[in-house]
Amino acid sequence: MTVEDFEELAAGAPEHVSLEFLFGQVGAKVMPDGDHSEMIKWLQRQCMQHRPDLWLYPEAGLVVEAYRKGRARPDGVLAPDGAFAGQGEWAEAAGVLMTVEVTSFDADTDGRDRREKPRAYAEAGIPVYLLIDRSTAEAVIHSEPVKGEYSVELRLPLGKVVTLPEPVGFDLETGALLSLIR
């Protein structure tokens, strides 16, 4: 399938279906549960407090992977306010400082959130990828993309202070997320 074919398919998908195209494969994102939504809301608030010059855009469509062949809808995209003005459904990743994913409880989570997305985001040159892994109750911080891979991966249990590296550059007190792990 070509990127153009995928974009046509995604444009015709029902409103409640969110499709992604990573490494030549079409995938459907699971609709978030309440705890997932609360985690994203909490993270939006943290980003606003620490970096009011930035905004955590939920579910923004991004052009990812090497050669701009992939399309992803991260749970959150941290970028300067107004970064996506004038862009279409699938925006260029230039200017994006961080992508965020919160794991879902589906069969695709391991391959998608833990393997494919770090590679796709690193290939796009996104400086930081934050994975809130509900299965392991960890925050996984990927940073310093080099040749399509993140050269640094740090795993911290939720409840600890998580330092997001530059260019994001602030600490997250993740204790509040523990009540959303079930």
Describe each region flagged by the PLM.
Residues M1-R182:
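Gly/Pro/Ser/Thr-rich low-complexity, intrinsically disordered segments predominantly at protein N-termini
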